[in-house]
Amino acid sequence: MVAADVIFLDTLLRGGWGQDFFPRTLPYVPGGGGAGEVLAVGDGVDPGWVGRSVVVRTGTGYAEQVVASAQEIMPVPAGLAAVTAAALVHDGVTALGFHRLGAPQKGEWVLVSAAAGGAGTLLVQLAVDAGARVVAAASSDAKLALARDLGAEVVVDYTRADWVERVREATGGGAALVYDGAGGALGATSVDALADGGRFVTYGTADGFAAPDRESAARRGIRLLMPLMDGPPDQETARELLGLALESAAEGRLRPAIGATYPLARAADAHRALAARTTVGKSLLLMGGE
């Protein structure tokens, strides 16, 4: 492995959350994947894999070496750095899946909350690329500056009491689409930033899943889309979306915003930073050191 993916879900699983979808028995190796080089193959596997740069989605990513099936790996496109590819292993799948679900249209206002996270930074770029106008919501000046650099037209600090009113004012009455990357009470509140008839796509779990008022949403014609309530995407879908994410990155149309890297021995520090909401951009573990 060259680099291992680190996502907020890893911190939740470490604490025992999500056993229905992600069963873990102690002791276990955390992590869900990363990127590296194939060192050897087993019987019946094409030896041409040896030496190739690949991404891998596996349940033991925080390791210098992992064992994976041929179905769990995918070649890294020529010219794309392994570290960049590792940053897309999960967030690329998440962002492209929700981009497909939310389907932002040219000229629409799109609100991305937790816009400076691994998936949020990608959703900002995807919405801008689709011709939408993006409002990015985050919790610090550094995070808002990153979102603006990625193409957000308007940025708001969602720690301010009036942040929803500011979104509605900037968008002329509310966004057509909200991507909720925060969850919890903040995610539920972000429904108020939608215009009537809008779409609400939530993937945030940092504070638990958002639980918006369904009756109120129905009266306003708002569609509540909560795909993670059904568990992670199946392997075939995840593989398709990861391939698209890698291709987009290789072509320069998608840029993971890697904001923090740690040596493997400091994985706990990576988790602490995510839990404290101090990380700006994507976090990775680098097997060769920091």
Write out the residue ranges for each language-model feature.
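NAD(P)H dinucleotide-binding glycine-rich loop of Rossmann-like/cofactor-binding domains
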Residues: 23, 33, 53-116
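A glycine-/small-residue-rich N-terminal strand-loop-strand element
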Residues: 35-58
